[in-house]
Amino acid sequence: FFTVRDILQRYRAEDVRYFILASHYRSPLNYSQENLEHGKAALTRLYTALRGIEPAAAGGDAGDAWVTAFNAAMDDDFNTPEAIAVLFELAREINRQRDSDPGRARALVTCLLALGSTLGLLQSDPDAYLREGGDPDAISEADIETLIENRLQAREEKNWAEADRIRDELEAAGVVLEDGPAGTTWRRS
């Protein structure tokens, strides 16, 4: 037995919303922690595509094909699983365009945010979503930042064993590090 309050102590409301929308409204909804974790992981993939790209001021026609596909899914007996599949196709295209055509990527981000908002998804700041864990016992942001600084110091000193140990410690605490040209970013797994 569980209550919505119990679920919301462990998962964000948006994770639960995604979990519900991922099933067609005429189909039975199979509640399980595993299915909620799948929903949380799926939202993490969408937010990861949005991370680091500001939306364009005006979307233009860059996302027209996805808007058409999304609307067709919604017009097909409110087929939210198919509409969500369109969001993932759009996220994949954003990831492909991220470096090669940043202007198009920004326009596609605008489209993804608009389509996601239709379903009540993708309403949070991507960095904030990816840094929140939902687990009250999780390692704090301050501790994560301190460990990242220690890791960067170890890397500067070419102390690879220490840098790897810190990465492993963060990974064990449910934190994923992403090293890039702009520095190290992190998100909760």
Specify the residue positions occupied by each region the protein language model found:
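Structural preference for alpha-helix termini/caps and helix-kink/transition segments
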Residues: 1-189
